Amino acid sequence: MADTSTRAQAATNLPSSLTSTPNYSSFAETAEMTITERPWWKNATVYQIYPASFKDSNGDGVGDLNGILSELDYIKSLGVDAIWICPMYDSPQVDMGYDISDYENVYPPYGTVADMERLIAAAHDLGIRVLLDLVINHTSDRHKWFQESRSSKDNPKRDWYIWRPAKYDADGTRRPPNNWRSNFGGSVWEWDELTQEYFLHLFCPEQPDLNWDNETCRHAIYDSAMRFWLDRGIDGFRVDTVNMYSKDPSFIDAPILDPSEQWQMAAGLYCNGPRMHEFLSEMNAILTSYNAMTVGECPHTPDRNKVLKYVSAKERQLSMVFQFDVVDVGFGQDLKYDTFPRNWTLPVLKDAITRTQQLIQGTDAWTTAFMENHDQARSISRFGSDKTEELRVKSGKMLALMLACLSGTLFVYQGQEIGMVNAPATWDVEVDYKDVESGNYYRYVVAKTKGDAEAKKRAAASLQHLARDHARVPMQWSDAANAGFTIAKEPWMRVVDNYKKLNVKTQEKDEGSVLAFWKAMLQLRKRNADLLVHGDFVLHVREDDKVFVFEKKFGGQSALVALNFTEDEINFEAPAVFEAGEAKRLVSTYEDGKAGPLRSFEGRVWVGRSKAS
């Protein structure tokens, strides 16, 4: 039954006269909401920047710190409160900077420490806080610590990394210490010829894991990776792979989940280990002295109670964590890419969002809201539609509305605010894709299937849908050459071909653009932070596979959010959540604000006094 009907009007108590263009400020006036004083990071929106791809200031084809500096006014115009800059430290760039060779220096193509200090100061002058990526589960194999560690078994830093002797079969064949599989494929163990032992790497062989059980090593990490930058004025860290510092010390074999594979998924043995909370308490003592916030990356942790141990205020561990329930929707069960495009249903997505939202209900914890980052493909391509320009805009606005109404600290990734989408299927996986994870997976499929054409086709389709490369292409600033990202003849990574129409400059002139809508929603979220940022989340009609309806409740007020996840018009009957005559239309993704059926990828929000229970 459409919401223009008598039945629907009775169910929702929505005045039929509310069909005019949405007034983004009306909620603050009509709902008489308040904004309670809280730590700055709880109400914040954080804008994530991938330095290599954001803006090139010197024409070498690679983004840099001065490029970020040049666009601070644009970032300020979005209405965000902080920026999170992905690793800008010195690095061989095997894993795009997540392999750090010197925490106290900047990767030369990005700039210098002095450039970083200027960027921090300029951001602060605009009221923008600065977060850096803290990557301390591992270093690069080029880091001086590892170079010393591998030089001999007697070196004082030998125990700063995790070394183990080989195992040998009856016939004398050398084997690694266990069967754990790396996050990027293959064994987690790499043989060192010089010292005749294996070292552990949960990611690339060029990213050896630090031994957090060594106290001297830990304190060197705190000084070099944390205090060095906190002393230069940063406001906090996004903490990479924060739950991997403490491993099961027995290094037993992982359960065999796939008998056809030599190496097995072992996250249960290297995540959330026995000393994790001891280590984080040490870190927190330092961070607290600087009044710095933290957001931890917490993969492979579906257990709510384990997550709460990290983010409960009384535990004094982390300010918040990224849970991966939402962004993992549609992934393969064992291997991320062992799936097919759009392998998900709306009820499954609803469940994932519900789990992350309800983390803070009845607890002293805090959560995050996000659908994109440097490790995820574009949300419109995954959860909306990029089939046409019209559908891209509609679904981009719908997802923006949804995210802006979710509780927790909101994170927006560069390009998300203009509705950037995945690179097209015409891109060559072996040429245009640059990410180590993409390349490793494709080569794994080719080797396993002996180059089977259909298997390669399936792998390419999966990468086109889920690869990290889609987040790492250059930012689309204008319709100029290379999307205005660089004046170089060729950028470090190919620009997506749709930049002529999909870019910042074009959208800044268009009041109906995805960019304009994101700006409006972020202001709306700020004005109504108690309800939209801190309100309790209630899921309605879980089984509906086309429409997502949820309610936010705070202090006797409710917001009802309805989202059409299809390109079709859908009749919609809202649940009765408001007192009679109390509901008012807050916002719609369609400018005309019409009532009636939910149109293609439409999102609407109503607000009012909650119905007495």
Where is each model-derived feature located?
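Active-site and adjacent substrate-binding regions of carbohydrate-active enzymes
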Residues: 2-613
